[in-house]
């Protein structure tokens, strides 16, 4: 199996592994901000000396499951991959240099539910080795009087659920 195929398989397994679990159990929470009307995804992992971005998948959540709306993978460092620092964000729909766009971006529609899964490889002083980490965030696009804006959906620990009502 090629390095690229291994990379994709690892990403798919990590995302599938966390699809129905709480954000703090098997995945860490990703951040979402807004840039030019689109979501911009970030990870905050202060223990990592280096974060290597492997890929990002964004899905629409429906009653029937999930539908991919954007997917990008990045080459591993030995193949010239770019490094992601905790302060940067990945803007939805951008074609990044050296990245492979597996699924071109679909328009994000107000009132629909979305989830983002970001896979990174991190090096930390504690482990002295590379490990894979999955970051997850749920969001929606909400229309107000003047425009459409991004809303990150919080995880409610006591209720063991996502607070999707903020998107209504």
What are these regions (language model features)?
Residues 1-20:
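Sec-dependent bacterial lipoprotein signal peptides
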Residues 21-27, 47, 121-168:
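Extended, polar beta-sheet/loop recognition surfaces of beta-rich domains
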Residues 79-113, 121-124:
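Signal that preferentially marks extracellular ectodomain short beta-strand elements
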């Amino acid at each position: 199996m090629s390095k690229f195929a291994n990379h994709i398989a690892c990403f798919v397994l990590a995302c599938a592994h966390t699809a129905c679990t709480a954000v703090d159990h098997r995945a860490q929470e990703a951040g979402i901000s807004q840039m030019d009307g689109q979501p911009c995804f970030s990870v905050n992992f202060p223990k990592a000396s280096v974060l290597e971005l492997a890929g990002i998948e964004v899905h629409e959540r429906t009653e029937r499951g999930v539908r991919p709306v954007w997917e990008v993978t990045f080459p591993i460092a030995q193949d010239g991959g770019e490094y992601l620092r905790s302060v940067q964000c990945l803007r939805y729909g951008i074609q990044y240099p050296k990245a492979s766009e597996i699924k071109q971006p679909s328009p994000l529609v107000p009132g629909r539910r979305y989830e983002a899964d970001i896979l990174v490889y991190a090096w930390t002083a504690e482990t002295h080795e590379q490990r894979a980490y999955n970051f997850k965030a749920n969001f929606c696009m909400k229309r107000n009087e003047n425009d459409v804006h991004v809303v990150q959906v919080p995880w409610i620990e006591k209720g063991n659920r996502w607070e999707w009502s903020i998107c209504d």
